[in-house]
Amino acid sequence: ISVGVSSQNLWLGPGQFSSLLMYSNPPGFNHFSIGTNRPLKTPLGSVEFNIIGGTLTAIERQGFENRNLKYYGNFLGTRYLSLLSISYNPVFFKNFYLTANRAFTLPTQEKPSSKLTDYYLIALKPLFRNVYQDNTAAIDQIISGFAKYVFPKENAEIYFEYGWNDGSSNLRDLTLDNSHSSASILGIKKIQP
């Protein structure tokens, strides 16, 4: 298990040229992390996890590609980030990986309380939003999951990632309206030796 403080930029997801949750184009941000530096072996397979909490600051000088687009809401202030990533490699299906990611951002002005778990570690709270928060706070939840299969002899992998940018109220809401504000990535990656 590793614990760290950093300001590096992060990439999260299997995509080679794009990512649904976090990509390394913007500058780094101040954050702390707790996670595994190598897979933890269990009888059912290997598990890796990473918990990240930090602050994001908007860069006001960067504009949109389309000049007619405007910022909506409070995007120019500082926001808290809470992120949880868990990866599983089953012992019975070698070279196959399943990963679940969950991230929250909330404006620093709307900090729900002074407890660390309510803003930096909010990603550890229950999945459905009516359990942990009302809908009045400007909290943004992003969830993604991906599967990838690695072909070691060919130095290649195939992957699929699916994510959405809205917290569900319950299991029924998740299953009936899972395409609301969703995105997906499908790809094949080949590394030339």
Residue ranges of predicted features:
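Outer membrane beta-barrel transmembrane domains
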Residues: N101, K111-F146
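Transmembrane beta-strands of outer-membrane beta-barrel pores
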Residues: S7-W11, G53-I59, R102-L106, F151, ...
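Long, repeat-rich segments with strong aromatic
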Residues: Y132-S184
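Well-ordered mid-protein domain cores that form the structural environment of catalytic cofactors
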Residues: I1-F49
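Residues that define the transmembrane beta-barrel architecture of outer-membrane proteins
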Residues: I1, M22-F32, T78-S82, I139-I143, ...
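Short loop/turn motifs that connect adjacent beta-strands in outer-membrane beta-barrel proteins
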Residues: I1, R38-N50, F92-Y97, V150-N155, ...
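Residues on the lipid-exposed face of transmembrane beta-strands in outer-membrane beta-barrel proteins
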Residues: I1, V5, F32-R38, L84-P90, ...
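Outer-membrane beta-barrel translocator domains and adjoining extracellular loop/strand segments
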Residues: G15-L20, I59-N68, E110-T117, N170-L176
